[in-house]
């Protein structure tokens, strides 16, 4: 899906900011070769996805998102976002290399 931008508001931005991440880091991680997987455990009235990406400095990030159409424009709505812990990064890198070697 090609997206037209991001859906930021007072509902989702504070959830991301409380973990010390910036909007620009989140947007970069989502636009530069992220790994995206469905998140059925957190999907209710709308589908949610888990996204693993990297900020401009290469730090791994975990981001929960949903996709919405607002005024006819498809947007990415980040919900929670945080930096990944070292153990999570190691697991992600192992899985990613196994996927790429298939």
What do the predicted segments below correspond to?
Residues 1-102:
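Ribonuclease/tRNase effector modules and their secretory precursors
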């Amino acid at each position: 899906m090609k997206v037209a931008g991001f859906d930021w508001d007072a509902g989702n931005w504070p959830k991301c900011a409380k973990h010390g991440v910036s909007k620009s880091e989140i947007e970069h991680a989502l636009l530069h070769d992220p790994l995206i997987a469905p998140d059925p455990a957190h999907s209710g009235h709308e589908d949610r996805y888990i996204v693993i990406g990297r900020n401009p400095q290469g730090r791994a990030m975990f981001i929960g998102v949903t996709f919405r159409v607002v005024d006819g424009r498809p947007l990415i709505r980040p919900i929670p976002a945080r930096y990944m812990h070292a153990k999570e990064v190691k697991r992600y890198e192992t899985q990613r290399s196994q996927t790429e070697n298939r």
